[in-house]
Curated annotation (Swiss-Prot):
Keyword Aminoacyl-tRNA synthetase included in the entry's annotation: no
Protein name: Phosphatidylserine decarboxylase proenzyme
Keywords attached to this entry: Cell membrane, Decarboxylase, Lipid biosynthesis, Lipid metabolism, Lyase, Membrane, Phospholipid biosynthesis, Phospholipid metabolism, Pyruvate, Zymogen
Function field: Catalyzes the formation of phosphatidylethanolamine (PtdEtn) from phosphatidylserine (PtdSer).
GO biological process: phosphatidylethanolamine biosynthetic process
Family statement drawn from the similarity comment of this UniProt entry: Belongs to the phosphatidylserine decarboxylase family. PSD-A subfamily.
Length: 225
């Protein structure tokens, strides 16, 4: 591996226009006052870093639920999935992963399966680390059905700084575990609703790596009727 590969990561195409804008502002600031220009360069480098999209090595063993986001587990609780997905109104274990502005913000599919529903709902822009952000904030919800009929939901939630949720998938698509399904710009949160009876293998405060960290194990039981 080259040394540059350690420090320079691929950038997601969604970030190109933002890096271009930051770069143009940096050039303009150099004309005004050189120290301001260097601040602009720093901001441009940060923007590039924010939109980095490194490759991830996703565990391939059957029955694993993989973290959909980089960040820290902020909440683990029982909650009903978003009504707009049309899932059962039974409370499920919800694991929330909070992403700050320094985390990679490309989101990855936790399990292989077929997209059954994608639903966007406008809302507020509260601090994404708050419990009520799941209900009140702008969100994009995705339901994936696995081969055994069980379903899992991923919910992208906007936050104080994040004001744009981007989804790459639509209903009927087949996804592989670890496949990119979206991103959220500039700080946010992703909730995962586990199938009935499945318990998380992570705890609050644990650091997660999207597409790599095992969040839960489905096990042999609990198959859909």
């Amino acid at each position: 591996m080259r040394m540059t590969d350690t420090f320079i990561k691929p950038m997601h195409p969604e970030g190109r226009k933002f890096v271009a804008i930051f770069g143009a502002i940096a050039l303009a600031l150099f004309i005004v006052w050189e120290p301001l220009g260097w601040i602009g360069v720093g901001a441009t480098v940060w923007c590039y870093y924010f939109f980095r999209d490194p490759e991830r090595v996703t565990p391939q063993r059957d029955g694993l639920v993989i973290s959909p986001a980089d960040g820290v587990v902020s909440l683990i609780e029982q909650a009903v999935p978003p009504a707009e997905l049309g899932m059962a109104d039974t409370p499920l274990t919800r694991v929330s992963v909070f992403m700050n502005v320094f985390n990679c913000h490309v989101n990855r599919t936790p399990v292989p399966g077929t997209v059954k529903a994608v639903a966007y709902r406008p809302g507020k822009f509260l601090n994404a680390s708050l419990d009520k952000a799941s209900e009140d904030n702008e969100r994009n919800s995705i339901c994936v059905e696995m081969a055994d009929g069980r379903q899992i939901a991923m919910v992208q939630i906007a936050g104080l700084v994040a004001r744009r949720i981007v989804s790459f998938v639509k209903g009927g698509e087949t996804l592989a575990a670890g496949e990119r399904f979206g991103l959220i710009r500039f700080g946010s949160r992703v909730d995962v609703y586990l199938p009935q009876g499945v318990q998380p293998l992570v705890s609050v405060g644990q650091t997660m790596v999207a597409g790599e960290t095992v969040l839960a194990e489905l096990g042999a039981g609990g198959r859909a009727a």
